[in-house]
From Swiss-Prot:
GO cellular-component term (any): cytoplasm
Subcellular location: Cytoplasm
Keywords annotated in UniProt: ATP-binding, Cytoplasm, Kinase, Magnesium, Metal-binding, Nucleotide metabolism, Nucleotide-binding, Phosphoprotein, Transferase
Cofactor(s) named in the record: Mg(2+)
Protein name: Nucleoside diphosphate kinase
Residues holding ATP: K11, F59, R87, T93, R104, N114
Active site residues according to the UniProt entry: H117 (pros-phosphohistidine intermediate)
Length: 152
């Protein structure tokens, strides 16, 4: 099995609204393996680096303020096709456009409070994982049911 990894963050609104267990459960039920997990209140510097691609956008300041306003649950998930699958589990950025059954479609209402962040590609995933986690914070392990998750 290809050991692709992605970065997922439950934003302060998702933590405050009590969705941590439900969101983790959706990824586990899908068959992905959690290899990194921590809860923290991000510094402004971390938030600015994370969302640096939006630095020139008018909403950048509000986004940084929001992400650093409360606890975030930062995670690294591993599995075959995890980046694309995670994006599908999460749903569209705008909750009103997100399909029912997705995390945002079921739980979010407002684009500025859309519960969760997920890496949008391999390069982004690597950047975000390296930004939020040190190598020693990531756990290499095998699930007892790994042979039942994939043919490879």
């Amino acid at each position: 099995m290809t050991k692709e990894r992605t970065f997922i963050a439950i934003k302060p609104d998702g933590v405050q609204r009590g969705y941590v267990a439900e969101i983790i459960g959706r990824f586990e039920k899908k068959g992905f393996k959690l290899v990194g997990l921590k809860q923290l209140i991000p510094s402004k510097d971390l938030a600015q680096n994370h969302y640096g691609v939006h630095r020139e956008r008018p909403f950048f300041g509000d986004l940084v303020d929001f992400i650093s306003s409360g606890p975030v649950v930062a995670m690294v998930w591993e599995g075959e096709g995890v980046i694309l699958s995670a994006r599908k589990l999460i749903g569209a950025t705008k909750p009103l456009e997100a399909e029912p059954g997705t995390i945002r479609g079921d739980l979010a209402i407002d684009i500025g409070r859309n519960i969760i962040h997920g890496s949008d590609g391999e390069d982004t995933a690597k950047f975000e994982i390296d930004l939020w986690f040190n190598e020693e914070e990531l756990c290499e392990w095998e699930t007892s049911d790994a042979k039942w998750r994939s043919e490879n």
